[in-house]
Every structure is written in C-alpha cells, then in structure tokens.
Amino acid sequence: MPSAGVERHDGARVISIVGPTASGKTGLGIAIARRLADRGERAEIVNADAYQMYRGMDIGTAKASDEERAAVRHHLLDVIEPSETMSVARFQQMARETIADLKSRGIRPILVGGSGLYARAAIDDISFPGTDPQIREHLEERERTEGATALFRELAVKDPQAAEHMDPRNPRRIIRALEVIEVTGKPYSATLPRYRYVIPSVQLGLDLDRADLDKRIDVRTRQMFDGGFVDEVARLRSHLGPTAARALGYQQVIDHLDGLVDLDDTMADIAQKTKRLARKQMGWFGRDPRIHWLSALNPALVDNAMAVIDHADAGDYDAIDMHAQEYVQHHLGDIRRPSGAGPV
C-alpha cells in the first residue's frame, strides 16, 4: 500500500520508452503493443522524436517502416513539412492532445523516441516560458554596456535560488533568466523542469554497453546509405528549414553532394557523430531516477518490460516516483543523477 500523502494513480500508465539512438526503442514499443493486444488491451505508439515528425525525412531519422506502422498504429509521424519550425512547446501540446484522445478511447499510449526533452515534455511538469525580443534586446545591450556581473547581481536579488546555481560568467543564461522573470512575473527557478508526472506514466530505458551500441550504430549507418539516404537528402535539401536541417546526417550528406567530402568519409563522420550523440542521450536519460533500465540484448526483454509495466499499473512505484525530485540536484540545465543507479 502507498504511504500516507502519496498520490495514487490507479489504472494503466502511459508507457514511455527511452534510450540512445539505435537501441531498439521502436521494436520494443511494437512488441509491447502486441503483448498488450494478446491480453485484450489496445495500445498505439506516439512518436517523441523531434525529427521523425517531418514528412519525407524517413531514412536519416530511422523512422518506423511501413510494415511496422501497419503492425501498430503510430501517431505524430509525418505531421509537418521540413520547411516548418518545430519547437518542444508545440510538440508538448500535440503530444498531450494525442495522449488524451487515445486514453479517452480506451487505447494505451506508448511514447517512443530519442529526444529526451520531447519525451519528458509530453508527461512531465515542464513549462516553456515565451520570449520577448524587446526585453532580450534591452538585456543584451545592458550586458554590453554594464557587463555580465551587473546583470548577475540583479538576478541574485530577483531570484537568489537561480543565482546560487548559475555561472556568473555565462551571460547567455543570465539574460535568459532575467527575460523569463520579466515575461512571466515569476522566478526563473520556478519554471525549471521537474521530475514529476502530470500524466501517470512508466518509463522504460534501453541499456547497452558502449561496444554493442557502437556496433549497432555502424550497422545502421551503412543500412541508411544502402537504403537510399543520399537520394533522400538530394530530394529534400531545398526544402529543409532551419530546424529540420539540424537533423544529424543531413548536412553531412549535403556536403558530400556538393563535392566537399567523399562517400566513405561522410559515412564515417555520421557514424562518429551518432556515437557522440548516443553518449549525450545516455547522460540525459541517466539523470532521471524514475527510468527502469532494461538490458536491450536480454532475450527476456519484453517479459521484463511487461513486468515493470504491471508493477507500475499496480501503483508499486508511486511512492518512489512522487519523490523523484528529491533525488536529483538542479544546476539550471545540468541535472545530476545520484550514484549507484544502474540498469535493471
């Protein structure tokens, strides 16, 4: 039984599958949906990868195949043009509307994606304060004339908690903090992400050792090029907006098409940058103490995932999840995970 004062969320949780690129999140999501279907429960996948939302960016983003989409319905794939701008705030609204719609129809949502902030934005207590160009321009001018130290002193008065954990030599963060205070009328520290579900959820993380993950990335990179990635980029390059163009691999292939880099070096560069991205993703997800880490190579992976889901549905993790915020330390963007937490 949950202890007194702990909120109990009865019923099926939203399932969120996270982990580094090439770890097998899509496959696990489909396997879980099928296993739930065997038990008489409908489930559908909600994409939480920023770049898979763009139409036509299929190969370079490792989007679910037609066969995979036929097996389990996917949402928030191919919803915007590459020329459009996608923001995490816009995604949050779309994802929460999709989740609410699915739940209202008795369908369990399974979030799948490698974009850490996007995955959290869908289910966590995260707000995204707007910007004000005039306020920002004024603060930037003050930084040029008065210096970052003066702005930092002002921040220390308006939001001591924010100033305590902020580098006084980082004017960009100081300016953003003062801008948020001016725009919202609230302390900047009050807008920071919190490890608290606003939608009852359970997070499954896929874990691999570095050598196995690197091998998967090398194989996937080769498969991308064998599958027509160069042709995909050639077709899309004139339509890529500033957000879509940041997707890893696309600019590298554009450089190849422009004759700046040969094909072998392009593939090697993409593989190396993907491995670097995977390390960053593991660092990001590793800070969240609520994630249940599962070995991606364990033959019993799906069974283990279902066991975690069943425990979550029964409320067995509620007490831990409710106190997750106490297990981490905020450094205004550098959120550290306690030692000792490892894969399940």
UniProtKB/Swiss-Prot annotation:
Gene3D superfamilies, A to Z: 1.10.20.140, P-loop containing nucleotide triphosphate hydrolases (3.40.50.300)
Alphabetically, which GO biological process terms does the record hold?
A: tRNA modification
Molecular function terms from GO: ATP binding; tRNA dimethylallyltransferase activity
Query: How does this polypeptide assemble, per the annotation?
Result: Monomer.
Q: Which cofactor does it need?
A: Mg(2+)
Keywords from the named record: ATP-binding, Magnesium, Nucleotide-binding, Transferase, tRNA processing
Highest taxon listed in the record's lineage: Bacteria
In chain numbering, where does the site feature Interaction with substrate tRNA fall?
115, 136
Annotated residues for binding of substrate: 21-26
Q: What does the record give as EC number?
A: 2.5.1.75
Q: Its function?
A: Catalyzes the transfer of a dimethylallyl group onto the adenine at position 37 in tRNAs that read codons beginning with uridine, leading to the formation of N6-(dimethylallyl)adenosine (i(6)A).
The record lists ATP as bound by 19-26
This protein is called tRNA dimethylallyltransferase
| A matching Pfam family | IPPT
Q: Which transformation does this protein catalyse, written as a reaction? A: adenosine(37) in tRNA + dimethylallyl diphosphate = N(6)-dimethylallyladenosine(37) in tRNA + diphosphate
Q: Which InterPro entries match?
A: Dimethylallyltransferase, IPT, P-loop_NTPase
The entry's family comment says: Belongs to the IPP transferase family.
